[in-house]
Amino acid sequence: METPEIELIGVAGRHRHGPTAGFTPPVPVTTLPLGSPWLYETWTRFRWPLVESVVDNIDLVHGTSIIPPATRKPLVVTVHDLAFLHHPEFFTKRGNKVFRRSLKMLLDDAAMVLCSSEATMHDCRAAGFDEERLRHVPLGVTTHDVTDVDRRRVQATYELPEKFILFVGTLEPRKNLSRLIQAVSSMRDAPPLLIAGMEGWGEEAPVLNHDVRFLGFVPAHNLPAIYEACTVFAFPSIFEGYGLPVIEAMAHGAPVVTSRGISTEEVAGGAAVLVDPLNVDSIVDGIRKAMSSADELRARGLERARDASWATTAELTVAAYRDTLERA
């Protein structure tokens, strides 16, 4: 989507290191004098430092997480979830405090709130946002062609078995890894579970045995080949605001098992096996069903993923910018 009348400038906290491997920011990025942990505190306590202190001549500010950047300009914020209201036990004490201060600031200051799912829209209404400030802006998915060279390289790098169940995500309590590990370990005929993701908090390291293997952080450019190679992608999270790995896995032909009753059901759009994330037997049954109907799930998942377009996300976001400036 071309929007020549819009100039985007990124603003980030100070980092010791550059972008992660394989990622180059698509826009120029200006750096604030503080790193992210300090920024979260000073933004939500003192509304400082202002974005305008490092970028001149801006019309509005778009914060891409619930923690709003400090600004005197019209503020648009993307809220992916309000999980801390549903499950405060899944977050650190400090995290809960920062998120609650952030929510109060958004209720007071945000001109527009972009929600990545209808489930998050519902939660924002319940939290006190009036309807005219809310916009549903679903996320898109980026697909990458996987070559034979990619397949061989990734297979060798991670020593991928012929068949495996895959989980992708940060290791944290709401991802429900303990029940997923129990489910796979209880299945005598199940392929091993491979866990790809960064360490988060509060989740004990997976038991490393023949049933479970931890890959650690996997760069984005390696994930498509792993999605493509997996037998089943299992994502039985307890709570998500969207669940981007679900649609990413579908876009690369993986049969998907995910949770019913949360936003991942919405994202899956009828193209996944849905399970009760709190019931290990349900997760087991879901994995078995996905393995037995893999071809059908692949076809439905690929069709569903075609509806998830970043171009649509961009169009809806630009429309929200224009509405915000017209009201300012």
Which role fits each region the language model picked out?
Residues 1-328:
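Carbohydrate transferase catalytic cores enriched for Leloir-type hexosyltransferases
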